[in-house]
Structure formats: C-alpha cells, structure tokens
C-alpha cells in the first residue's frame, strides 16, 4: 500500500513541475525577390513507342542432333540402358526456352533408339517423393545423379547453356549413375 501511495505522490509532484518558458526570438525573415524569368521551351511528348525485344527462335533440333550422334558413338556407352534426361539449365543472363531444348534432346535420343528414356511422369513422381519442386531444375550434377539412382537409371544426361562474352554454348555430359563418371562430353554453339 505504501508503494502505491509513493507512486501516486511522485506522479503528482512531477506533474506539477513546470519548466520556465524559453524566451527565444524568432529567426529573422528577409524577403527575397524572384530573379528574371527564363523562358523554357516545353518538352513535347515523344510519339515513339519502343519495340519489345524479339524472342530469338533457336533451332534446337539442329543443335542437339549432332551432339546425340557423337554421344551414340562414345566409348563405354551401352545401348538399351535406362537414361534420365535432366532438364536443360540456363546459366546465361538471358531467357531461353529450356523446355523446348529438353524436348529436342529427348526426341533426338528417342529417334536413335539407343536408350530407354525415363518418362516425365516417373520423373514427376520421383521429384515429389524426394521433395523436389517441379520448378527445381536440379542445377547440380549430384542432384541429377541422386534422382537417377532413385529411378534406377543407368545414365544421366546433364545439359547446361552457358554464356561467355555474348557467345552461348550448349554443353552436354553423359554420366554413369553408379560412379558419377563422365562417359562423354560435348558442346555446341547456339548463336
């Protein structure tokens, strides 16, 4: 009870304290006359509308076909084995239609009848089981090999589009899933 009484009295004492009012003079204001008006020409709005950048169409089939031919002749590649074609990664600063590139790779391999290709539905189910989102382009070779092991694939085809001084290249690597050994590697200019 004494504490409450002490707090109330302290509050009343502090509330009754008043600081003396400061007697400061306001800052002097000096009027400034405007200078001569300069004539300005109004800026006319431009009627020119900029064109959006054109999407460059890339002939993925023409780029991929020679690489698949090379891969089919590579030493150590056995026909009839199961292949996981990983989606193409875009390591450029521009936009690319990597889905079309991946489809071109799958079509070229299917036409050669070299491998049994893991279906998209199996890949989708495996990604869900492993907790990988469908937007995850795997990005790392280790993730690609892990997914291939889960799917019991024998090979993984890892593909990356990279850019160096304006020159874009498609690099492909065929890897053995058991060891991670790169059996074949090839690249081709895109531009």
Swiss-Prot record:
Keywords: Cell outer membrane, Cell shape, Lipoprotein, Membrane, Palmitate, Peptidoglycan synthesis, Signal. GO terms for cellular component: periplasmic side of cell outer membrane. Interacts with PBP1b. Its main location: membrane. It comes from Xenorhabdus nematophila (strain ATCC 19061 / DSM 3370 / CCUG 14189 / LMG 1036 / NCIMB 9965 / AN6). Regulator of peptidoglycan synthesis that is essential for the function of penicillin-binding protein 1B (PBP1b). Belongs to the LpoB family. This is Penicillin-binding protein activator LpoB. InterPro entries: LpoB. HAMAP family: LpoB. A lipid is attached at residue 17 (S-diacylglycerol cysteine). It is a lipid-anchor. A lipid is attached at residue 17 (N-palmitoyl cysteine). The gene is lpoB. One of its GO terms (biological process) is peptidoglycan biosynthetic process. Residues 25-48 are annotated as: Disordered. GO terms for molecular function: enzyme regulator activity. Residues 1-16 form the signal peptide.
């Amino acid at each position: 009870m004494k504490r409450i009484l002490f707090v109330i009295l302290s509050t009343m004492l502090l509330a009754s304290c008043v600081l003396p009012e400061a007697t400061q003079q306001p800052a002097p204001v000096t009027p400034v006359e405007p200078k001569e008006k300069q004539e300005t020409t109004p800026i006319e709005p431009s009627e020119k509308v900029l064109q959006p950048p054109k999407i460059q169409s890339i002939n993925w089939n023409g780029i991929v076909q020679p690489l698949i031919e090379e891969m089919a002749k590579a030493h150590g590649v056995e026909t009839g084995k199961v292949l996981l074609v990983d989606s193409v990664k875009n390591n450029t600063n521009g936009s690319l239609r990597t889905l079309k590139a991946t489809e071109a790779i799958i079509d070229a391999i299917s036409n050669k009848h070299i491998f049994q290709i893991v279906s998209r539905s199996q890949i989708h189910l495996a990604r869900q089981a492993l907790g990988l989102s469908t937007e995850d382009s795997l990005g790392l070779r280790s993730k690609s090999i892990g997914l291939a092991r889960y799917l019991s694939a024998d090979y993984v085809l890892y593909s990356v589009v990279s850019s160096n001084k304006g020159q874009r290249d498609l690099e492909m690597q065929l890897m053995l899933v058991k060891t991670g050994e790169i059996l074949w590697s090839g690249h081709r200019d895109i531009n």
